Structure formats: structure tokens, C-alpha cells
Amino acid sequence: MLAKYSSTRDMLDADGDTTMSLHSQASATSQRPELGHTEHQRPSSAWRPVALILLTLCLVLLIGLAALGLVFFQFYQLSNTQQDSILQKEEKLGNLSRQLQSLRTQNRKLAETLHHVAEKLCRELYNKTGEHRCSPCPEKWKWHGDKCYQFYKESKSWQGCEYFCIAENSTMLKINTQEVLEFAMPQSYSEFFYSYWTGLSRNSSGKAWLWMDGTPYSSELFDVMIDLTSLRSRDCVTILNGKAFSKDCRELRRCACEKAAAMVKVQSLHEPLSRRWR
């Protein structure tokens, strides 16, 4: 009986152990998903700060882009404003430049008009007195047209007169217009046959007559009287008593020089005008 009880208890213990073992296995099986779920949730909690940081960086980047866009917009507006201002200034500068050019043109025209009036008045005074301080020519020089003339009493060869005129900052007399001819020929009248060298010459009898600057002589203005009895290697022209003669360039004749007239001395007109208006 004891043996039967003992075997029965052993069987119960064995069943209990089996039951406990099955319960333990079931408990372990039921607990594994919870551990897996716990392990699955841990990475999610770890990425939250990273995601928050990335979101913050994105917001900062968006704010920076917005600020950059605002700055670019302001710079664009400022650039357009400055460009408009530059265009306006360039337009004003162009208008001022045109006005200045117009004033310069008017000033030049006024100066030319003043010069013509002063020259006309000075010429009237000069023709009345034969000499005036307003004359654009040096002292003792004769004013005619736009040139100054001087007929010297010194006698020299043709080349000597050339050097003499150069020393006086002038050239030898050139008769190339009717006005100059009508002015110069009366200066050649002399009771003692003093003729004046001109700047007209030629190298030989077969060559053309040329003035000192290389321009040709015009026979329509005056004729040159040539002495055919004497042959020379070089001929030069003198004027005497309203006529032109071919002479040996080595002969001694008086010098006639010319130079361009300067500006009329306007300030020298004030004194005669004040006396004239009194």
C-alpha cells in the first residue's frame, strides 16, 4: 500500500514537474515577444533627438535662405535705384555738356564778331592816321589785308635779303593777288631808282618762276621784264616804279619783307573811342 501511494505520489510529482515545465515554457514563450517589442522601441527613442536636430537645422536653413532672399531682393532694389540714379546723372551730364558746347560756340561767335568789329574800327583809325596803337603789326610795319609789310632801305643781295627777312621772323615779299599787287607796286616808286627784291626767282632761263614757298608765278598779275643780253645761272625779280624786272641775284637791292598780322589790340581802342565820344 505504501508502495502504491509512493508510486502515485511520484506520478503526481512527475505530472507537476511536467506541468510546471510546460508553464515555464509557455511563460517564456509569452515573454519573448515583449522582449522583442522592447528591443524594437529602443531605436525609436534614440532617433528622436537626431530627428529634432535635423528639423532644427532645416528650420535654420530655411530661415537663412529667407534672409538671403530678402538681402538679395533689397540689393536688387538698391541696384536698380542706383542704376536709375546713374542714368539720370548721365542724362544731366549730357545736357550740361551740350549746354557747355553751345556756350562755347556762342562765345566763339561773339569773339569772332568782336574781332571783326575791332579790326574794322582799327583799320579805319589806321587809314586815317597811317599808324595806330591798335595795329596788329610791329612798329613801322605797314598793315594791309591780313599781312604786315616792311620795305627796308638797306641794300643786300637776294640771298642776303632772304636771311634778313628770316631774322625779322618774316619772309620775302610775295605778290600773288591783285590786292597785294596794288599795294606793293606803289611802294616801289623811287626818284633814285631804288628797287626791292621780291621772293620770286628761277634757277635758269628755261625754268619756271617760283616764289620762295614753291608756288608758281602767275603772268596774269604782272609781267617780268627780262634782259636777254645777259645770261645768268639764276634770276631774281625786283620791283621798281610799278614794274617787275629780272636781275642778277648777286646785285645789291633793297629788301621787302612780309609776315602774318597778329590780333588787333582791342584794349588800344578804348582811349581813342573815349576821346571820340566826348
UniProtKB/Swiss-Prot annotation:
Principal cellular location given in the protein's record: membrane
GO CC entries: plasma membrane
SUPFAM superfamilies for this protein: C-type lectin-like
Topology Extracellular: residue spans: 74-278
Cytoplasmic compartment residues: 1-52
InterPro entries with a match to the protein in the record: C-type_lectin-like (IPR001304), C-type_lectin-like/link_sf (IPR016186), C-type_Lectin_Domain_Fam1 (IPR052309), CTDL_fold (IPR016187), NKR-like_CTLD (IPR033992)
Membrane disposition: Single-pass type II membrane protein
Compartments (UniProt record): Membrane
Transmembrane segments: 53-73
Cysteine pairings via disulfide bonds: 165-257, 236-249
Biological process (GO), any one: signal transduction
UniProt-annotated glycosylation sites, renumbered to this chain: 95, 169
GO MF annotation: an example: transmembrane signaling receptor activity
CDD domains, per the entry: CLECT_NK_receptors_like
Domain C-type lectin: 144-258
Keywords recorded for this protein, A-Z: Disulfide bond, Glycoprotein, Lectin, Membrane, Signal-anchor, Transmembrane, Transmembrane helix
Chain segments carrying region Disordered: 1-42
Ranges of biased composition (kind: Polar residues): 18-32
Name the record gives this protein: C-type lectin domain family 1 member A
Organism, as annotated: Bos taurus (Bovine)
Encoding gene per record: CLEC1A
